[in-house]
């Protein structure tokens, strides 16, 4: 749901972009702190668009409920996404410029449980 919310925001941001592009990347990364806790293995997902970027005046509040850069938006998508990601022990961040926005999600992976699932499959 979190990734879908961010993807929908990217899609809506591209309505006036001449050659719209959304890129989703994922990778495994190691030993990074999230909210002061160091996790040994994490999944990082990045959603990148080439839209106009998030207006500077709302960037600091972008994860607050009811904050939206769109007139038709509810302002709940990013707030809900952040809550979902935090429930799973993860973190979300973004970088936005006039030529696009990148949202990055980091979520810890429990390698032991993945290995157990693979063995029982």
Region locations from a protein language model:
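A short glycine-centered beta->alpha linker in the GHKL/HATPase_c
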Residues: 14, 52-55
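Short beta-strand/loop element within the Bergerat-fold HATPase_c
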Residues: 19-32
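Glycine-rich nucleotide-binding loop
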Residues: 21, 42, 53, 75, ...
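Acidic ATP/Mg2+-coordinating residue in the GHKL
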Residues: 49
């Amino acid at each position: 749901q979190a990734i879908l919310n961010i993807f929908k925001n990217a899609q809506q941001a591209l309505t006036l972009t001449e050659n719209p592009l959304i890129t989703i990347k994922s990778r495994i990364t190691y030993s990074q702190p999230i909210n002061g806790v160091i996790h040994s293995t994490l999944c990082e997902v990045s959603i990148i668009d080439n839209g106009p970027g998030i207006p500077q005046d709302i960037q600091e509040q972008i994860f607050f409920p009811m904050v939206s850069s769109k007139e038709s938006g509810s302002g709940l998508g990013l707030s809900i996404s952040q809550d979902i990601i935090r429930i799973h022990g993860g973190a979300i961040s973004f970088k936005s410029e006039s030529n696009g926005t990148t949202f990055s999600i980091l979520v810890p992976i429990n390698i032991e449980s993945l290995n157990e699932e693979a063995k029982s499959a």
